Regions:
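A residue-level marker of the well-folded mature domains of exported/periplasmic proteins
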Residues: 2-8, 22-323
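C-terminal motif of bacterial Sec signal peptides marking the signal peptidase cleavage site
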Residues: 16-21
């Protein structure tokens, strides 16, 4: 059953993003000390995802004692499940998955369990029974939505406010949970969702959907945009500017991720508020793989703490951030 309320521990502290590459190994070989890991990534749809991939490659590098078999599924759930089955057939020591969507994982996770290959979930969650995977490490997406919604509730209050939403990939944990958390936070305010469509977490998708919103409602008919990630917000900014509007003023924008391009847009006043979603999960995932393979008992869920940024706060930290 779906675990929406995680009872895991919050993991604090900075994580370093190193610029190392993964090996191109073909299977579960290597010397006795090398741990072979298959990593099924969602794709390369956003700046956040690219930073997450680099963090994973650095943590699972040869220098760290790993052989990494990497697959990016281009946001295709069927292709991602096929990649996991390929890892199983190769006899890897462990599998790490950033699930594109929450549903449809029961069978392949059971296959991994039958092959005695532990699976670590990274970033996103699944609805499969918890005994089919060893652990999960990632962010509290519902809390991110709540924090974004709390800013909107404070900024607009009881003022009648027309909001449009750029959703993440349909069926994905961050899209589902960020929507749920935001809705909780704005309950009882004057904010009304007049339209909500998926931009699939991509900049092009955000631009295209926002163009449709503007054509339908006009710049003057939209007060607030809630984007489930920065890349979609950045695409929406392009659409607003192309229509003659001023992002951050004519249409206020709240977004989630805090990647560098998004933070710069916040500093420039084109985004009004950003909730962080830390992509640097590699070291934590690698540590979990080692612990699980060593037979240690590990917590099922592991949260990484997020923070929020105003324009002034973004200006103070942007030069020191790794992503």
């Amino acid at each position: 059953m779906k675990s929406k309320v995680f009872a895991g521990i919050a993991l604090l502290g900075a994580m370093t993003l190193a610029a190392t590459a993964c090996s191109g190994g073909s299977g579960g070989g290597g010397d006795d000390d090398t741990i072979t890991v298959g990593f099924a990534q969602t794709g390369s749809e956003s700046g956040w995802r690219s930073a997450n991939t680099e963090s994973m490659k650095a943590a699972f590098s040869e220098d760290e004692g790993f052989e990494l078999i990497f697959n990016a599924a281009d946001n295709d759930p069927a292709a991602q499940i096929s990649a996991v089955r390929d890892f199983i057939s190769r006899g890897v020591d462990a599998i790490v998955v950033a699930p594109i969507v929450e549903d449809g994982w029961d069978d392949v996770l059971q296959e991994a369990s039958d092959a005695d290959i532990p699976v670590i979930l990274e970033d996103r969650t699944v609805t499969a029974p918890e005994d089919l995977y060893a652990a999960w490490v990632g962010l509290d997406f519902t809390k991110e939505g709540v924090m974004a919604g709390e800013w909107a509730a404070e900024a607009f209050g009881d003022t009648p406010t027309k909001m449009v939403v750029l959703e993440g990939t349909t069926g994905s944990a961050p899209a589902n949970d960020r929507a749920e958390g935001f809705a909780q936070a704005i309950e009882g305010t004057g904010i009304e969702t007049i339209d909500s469509q998926t931009g699939d977490f991509t900049r092009d998708g955000g631009k295209t959907v926002m163009e449709g919103f503007i054509q339908k409602y006009g710049i003057e008919g939209i007060d607030l945009l809630y984007a489930h990630n920065d890349d979609m917000a950045l695409g929406a900014i392009e659409a607003i500017e192309a229509a003659g509007g001023v992002p951050g003023q004519d249409i206020q924008i709240v977004s989630i991720d805090a990647v560098k391009d998004g933070m710069q847009a916040l500093i420039d006043g084109k985004i009004n508020f950003i909730v962080e979603c830390n992509p640097l999960l590699g070291d934590l995932a690698a540590g979990l793989v080692r612990d699980v393979l060593a037979g240690e008992d590990v917590e099922k869920t592991h949260f990484v703490e997020d923070q929020t940024f105003t324009q002034e706060q973004a200006a103070e930290v942007i030069d020191s951030r790794a992503y």
